[in-house]
């Protein structure tokens, strides 16, 4: 007897950024009032700043190449997709700040990359007691809750975690209480690709 199951829903891609590349990414992030990006974002976060796209792309090429291969298989593209970074920004998240459930408009895919996860936040998450996923988690939501259907994926991120997903995939970031600063980079992309004929 043979059997199979079918992939369903959006592609949620994950990989880990190498330490050397994390160091380079940190070097292109800065708190510059002239680069304030908050007017374009949904987050309740005080410090969010634009990143130079050329610098970001130069570091991220190998990871976007891996995503390209995954997308080719998931979406049955004839060839790899042409991926263009349209915006990138750094988030300096502090106690009490959060990102409400939202999507990214004007793009095909989005990503989030975690640069620094302080130990205090890890301990706060481990100590959490409750039915949710706890402080500092990122959650992705697809569709509505229903029996025998997986509609959400939740992660407590580690340093170097990189997630890439359709811009239309709802996601949110839980707040935390620790007196620390967690740094992440988000980006949006447009994708041009030709699907395989059915």
Predicted regions and their residues:
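PLP-dependent enzyme catalytic core of the Aspartate aminotransferase-like
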Residues: 198
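Non-heme Fe(II)/2-oxoglutarate
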Residues: 1-82, 89, 96-99
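Catalytic core of non-heme Fe(II) oxygenases with the double-stranded beta-helix
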Residues: 87-164, 181, 191, 195
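Ligand-binding loop in jelly-roll beta-barrel domains
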Residues: 170, 174-184
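Histidine-centered metal-chelating micro-motifs
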Residues: 97-98, 168-172
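A generic structural signal for short, non-catalytic loop/turn and secondary-structure boundary residues
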Residues: 6-8, 78-83, 104, 131-133, ...
